[in-house]
Structures are given as C-alpha cells and as structure tokens.
C-alpha cells in the first residue's frame, strides 16, 4: 500500500493510506457529501460509529499507523478536501446572499433519511416572506440549506473527514496507478499558506457545474482609467459584498458575521449584466432594498431610516440565449391540483412530454447475437414515446402543449403589457420553452414581477462595450454597444454564469481528456478548418479529439434516424446572433453514465469517478442515486456477472462504451440540452445498472406517471443494493 509524504512548515510526516476519497472544490455540496456517506456505507459495515469527531486540520490518526500494523479490517481512510471555508457548495455560508432561494420547494432538496424540518430543530426565520403558502410548497431559503447540510453531515459523522481551505492545484497519475495531488493550504493567516502533496488510491471529483465563475474582462474606454476592482464583481461575490456594506447576516441567530460598526453603504445605482436566473434574483434584491424586507437579514440597515430606491440597470445582450423563461411558483397537475412548479417537473408525466428526453419510440431492431447469424430481432423503446413523439400527430399535440405553456408563462410575466414603457418586452425569451436549450427558472421571490416592473428598474438589450473608472469618484462608467452610456454606477455585477471546466491542472495535459473531463482547447481543433493544422497543441490531445469526432459523426446519423424531428431544435428556434470571438473553447465532458472515463473502464481501472456533471432542476433526486452507482463502480460492484438483471461493465466492449458516451454528447449538442438530463429517466438507467427497480411509487401506471418523485422515493437503496449483492 502507498505511503504519503506530506511536506509543510519545514517538517515531514509519513502516513499510511488505504483509500482516499477526494471530492474537491465544492465537495461539500450535495454530491460530495452524499458520495462520502454512501462510499463509507458500502465499504465499512460498522459505519457510522457513535463516536463524534469534529473537523480538524490534522491528518486522521489512522493515517499515522505504520504499514505493518494495518489490517484488512481497518476502517476505510477517507479525506474530503474543500477549497472554501465551510461546507455547502452553492449553499456554503460565504456564498449566501440576502434573497437567495433554492429552485426547489420543501421536500425536494434534502436527503432521503432526514427532512429539512428535522435539521431546523424548531428554528425559523422571523422574516420569512411566505407564511401564507403551504409548507410543502415553500421554496427553501439558502440559509436553511446551509444549516441542513451541516446538520446532516454531523448525523453521519462526516466532519472528521473534512479539510477546509485545502485547494487542489494539480492532479497527476503515477506509474503505480496512484493519484498524486498537489495542494495549497490557505489558513486564516495568509502568511501561513503552505504547499503539500498527498497520494491516494481512489479519487472522486465533485466540483459540479458552478465552480469556475465566468468573469468577463472589460477594457476602459479610450482616455479613461480602468474601473476600480471592488466596483466590478461576479454574482458569486454578492454575499461577501452584502456583509461588508449592508451588515448581511447569512444565518439567522448566528453572529458569525457581526454587523459592521461603520454606516452601511447602500448604492445609488447598480448594473447587473446577464439574463439567467441569478440576474433576476439580483435585480429583485436591489430593486426592493429600500423596503427593508426582514427576510433579507440586513442588520446594517436602520429600520427607522428612509432609503431611496436603488436605480437598477439590467443589461442583457441582444444576442445569445436571451433572458430566461420564468415559471410561476405554482403549476397545475393533469388532475387539476396546484402544486409547486418544481414538483410538477419531478414527475414522469413531464418527462414523457418533453422532447428533450431521449426516449426511443417502440420499434423492432436488429441486435448482435451469439447465434449463427450473428444478429437477432429485438423490441426496444417506449409505447408512450411512440404515441407522443414517434408520429406527426403526437408531435403536433406535444408542440401545442408547450406553446400553450409559452402563453401561460408569458401572460403571468406580462410581456405584452404596454404599461411601464413597454420594457417587459425586453424580457421576452428568445425561444419557446419547447426548445431544450432555453434557460429556465422559477419566479419564486415575493412580488417578483412587481419589482421588475417598478420605475427604478431599467432594462437594456445590448452588450457592454467598455467599463471605465471615473477620476472624480469611485464609480464606474458603462458604455453599451448601442452607444448608450449609463449614469455613473456604484456597482457592476456580472451574472454571467460559470465556465464548464474543472479548475485543476492535470499533468500530463492529455490526462484531462483521458479522464473524460472538459478541456480548454483551440476552437480550430474542435471545428476543423484549413488553419487547424497550424495550431500548436499536444499531439495526444489532437489525437483524442479527432478520435471522438469520427464516433460523433456516426452517432449523429443514428440519432437523427431513430429520433427524427425530436433530434433537432424546432424550426422556429432563433440562433445566436453573437459570433464567438474567443479562439479557445471547452471540449464536452465524455463520461460513461456522466461519471466514469471510458479509457479507465476499458483498462479495468476502478479508481476514478466524477460526480455532479449533470444539469437538473432536482439535484437532490439525482445525487443519492449517482452516489450509489459511483460507490458500486469503485468497489467492483458493477463487475459482478452473477446478477443478470444488472449492468456488468466488464461485458461491455470499448466500442459499446464509446458509442454510449458519444450519443449522450451528440444528443446534448443536437437538441441544445447540453449537460441537462431528465432526472427520472437518468435515475432509471442508473438503478437498472444496479439491478434495482426504477419504479418506486407503486399504485399502478397512472400513479407512477403522475406522482412527485422526491428524494424519499429512493430511501433505502444502499441497503437494498448491499443485500442483493450479499454485502454486510
């Protein structure tokens, strides 16, 4: 077994490692936490022990035992590394901002073994804005999710494995098949920053899709100075800005960030750049700041002082995907029942109606066989898919359904209103909801559209041309591409989303692609031109990209043949009018089941898994099933050929795995769905791989079709899988 030399503060220590589960960067979001708990459940029959251990900066004692004192009965050694200062990922305390709400209502963002109300322990928000809404339909404030994840991690004794402020900078694969991690440890005192290297046998990455902010660099206008750095921030930094300037207290009753002694600095003008859901939230927050909503937890604002409404300039470029569609907070089920909109989306009913779900229509097909012909006839696919998507009449009615939804959501928002200077027309989404690439969100803030329609909100459909400083003040001057210059602005917030790559250096460079991860490569390589031959890039990277190009071409032909019109966006989709200007682009993730690298699968290597590289409206419903699949893969549970109703990954050829991965990538590209998945369809596939039934609701076909799948539908799947495989 490997030994680790950890270098820090001029001293060397030697530790013993059996397994190191690393989930880095945002490990402590949903995916990382449930992965750690599930892996320990699968590998250690005594987990969780009753012993409660708190987080420490030390290496666990089990790492210090000499090699010859370890036995096969020792507990699994496990570490969870986090570059931030607290757990929670998106819901970490340092990332919360005043009106941050989950896109999930109560019951949909929790683990199956512990409800959100259990973690609250009687604590409630004195300023909660939706007390008249039934509890099960309330959208969850960010602070509650932060508190929930902390309580749940304590229940499963996870703090003892956590290491905060440990940033993984480099990952290498050694000839011994170990993983080498270069780490920078950032303590509270910058002068104490140190570097170290550790080794591990098994590695899980769970940074998710929101780890690297997409920060745009704006040049100043000619003859003007650059804008002050503190006046141009990303949406990720809004929470710290609110703590410093408005006395924001993220967790009610917890004085971790006391109100500032200096007077609060309420901005006069704020500019917000972007059209995704986060931009809607930020516009709402600043537009209603003068109302001093107690649910914002702004302790720096004196309740007796009058505050002028903040002038909010909302800038959305005129090209690209446009503003997001915003669903009403409640929607109707087929039986007429009105429930939270996110719960409607967590039913099979919506999945089968969506053209974004790759459901094969029922059909006869030829499959390879061991008989003398080498082929056999087989029936595959879904009758519902044949009825709804496999014929012109079905597609017509599906299209009518989504067009009716367009009108319903548009009427709710008031896009056609001639009032307010017609500014609501600027927020009309570019494409229909039926287009899989259309950005979506839920208008779950109180008085959401009223705040947007208010006279202190100004909407501009143009790109930012330049951002400059002002010599006589600390404000910024923003020039737009349509020749508009905004009034002097105190704060520019980039609600520009996230980059799709993992923020770690992999060595050698081709390792990134070999692990199935996204890699920043020259655009000319991804879209070959005559000049592509002149682009300097690692030969192995170029070889891998061209290898996948050939497979993708075959996959595209097959998908168009099987899915017909559903394999492409509707004819009325408006393409982006903004030509790409960056000479680099990110290659797609190529992960089998969105988790494992095809190259490692072929080699029989069960040491690496990536989690959270799926885009879904119901993260918690996916996370628990993904975690079990990952644990099964890492421990050889998917190599078992004795269970005939489960996946035997050893029985799959490399070409089978590559075809599956390629079709997943090509489907995302052709339809516009990208990394998005239909939650229940994806979970069904993983559960079938594990030999478990995907149908968890019972009560017959209609009940299965219309019931809301919450995480509790998957309660007990770890024990169910262990029993099926004879594991203690």
Curated annotation (Swiss-Prot):
It is a single-pass membrane protein. Residues 50-72 are annotated as: Disordered. One of its GO terms (molecular function) is monooxygenase activity. Its main location: membrane. FAD binds at residue 168. InterPro entries: FAD/NAD-bd_sf (IPR036188), FMO-like (IPR050346). Its EC number is 1.-.-.-. Belongs to the FAD-binding monooxygenase family. The lineage of its organism: Eukaryota, Fungi, Dikarya, Ascomycota, Pezizomycotina. Residues 50-64 have a biased composition (Polar residues). The chain crosses the membrane at residues 17-37. Signal peptide: none annotated. This is FAD-dependent monooxygenase avaB. It is found in: Membrane. Keywords: FAD, Flavoprotein, Membrane, Monooxygenase, NADP, Oxidoreductase, Transmembrane, Transmembrane helix. PANTHER family: DIMETHYLANILINE MONOOXYGENASE.
